[in-house]
């Protein structure tokens, strides 16, 4: 018996704003929206079921120990789209026969796209 990844959860200052960004990034759709909590659900019910956003009083102050990795058929076009949604490009890295771009979401959470 093993576990499976059910949700990815973000602590954030503004759940509504951050969930709008990640909804545009992933295509996940809002199913619960409150001032202090937003839940997005996967439209196709495969993989991670949803992304949760919980309001916390303090902003992010240090590098995350965990991050989300995204894949795209055309990473460069997707990076430009994500920047248009409010993401920030931080770094480009190569290793182990692959490459990826490190980015920040609107609240400073790290994620990568390759």
Feature names for model-found ranges:
Residues 1-19, 66:
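N-terminal beta-strand motif that seeds the catalytic metal site of vicinal oxygen chelate
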Residues 2-10, 31-33, 38-42, 46-54, ...:
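Vicinal oxygen chelate
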Residues 15-29, 78, 82-86:
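Amphipathic alpha-helical segments
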Residues 61-82:
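Mid-chain, well-packed structural core segment of small domains
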Residues 55-60:
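Short, flexible, solvent-exposed loop/turn segments with mixed acidic/basic and small polar residues
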Residues 14-15, 74, 100:
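Residue-level preference for nonpolar/small residues embedded in alpha-helices
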